[in-house]
From Swiss-Prot:
Gene name in the database record: hslV
Full protein name: ATP-dependent protease subunit HslV
Quaternary structure and interacting proteins, as annotated: A double ring-shaped homohexamer of HslV is capped on each side by a ring-shaped HslU homohexamer. The assembly of the HslU/HslV complex is dependent on binding of ATP.
Swiss-Prot/TrEMBL keywords: Allosteric enzyme, Cytoplasm, Hydrolase, Metal-binding, Protease, Sodium, Threonine protease
Residues annotated as catalytic: 2
Amino acid sequence: MTTILSVRVQGKVVIGGDGQATFGHTVMKSNVKKVRSIYKNQVIAGFAGGTADAFTLFELFEKKLEKYQGQLQRSAIELAKDWRTDRLLRKLEALLAVADKKNSLIITGTGDVIQPENDIIAIGSGGPYAQAAAYAYALVYNTNLKASNIVKKSLQIASNICIYTNQSFTIKEIKSEK
């Protein structure tokens, strides 16, 4: 379990995540890099779920981005189709949160590609806590915090509540057209 959060505000899109990997109720590693810059640093992506499964999906998604010349939505849809229909891929248990300068998406193993409302994505066990915090910072308080600070503060809140989330954060940022 983990917490991955993406926020798009003030001309930036940010994805951040914690670094904890667990096996059952045991922490196996505390510094897993679950957020990465991919496709010529034009796309950022984070994963929740099985680590090995997610790394496999990262590789497949990168191949789709190469094949479709960085078209995020098309690449996501093609990955979701493969993920849903391929016998081996269907067994992979992970979610991907991906973003480029125009779009933010969640890709699921059931073949769903979801574009979030309000450009906030939260996945993983601590996702609801981080999402609530991000909404509070971005919408309720109408803050002037940078996107990266909203993500960091929201992940800190989630890590204080969710036992499967730690404070070893990886945060990636790219420019947004929105």
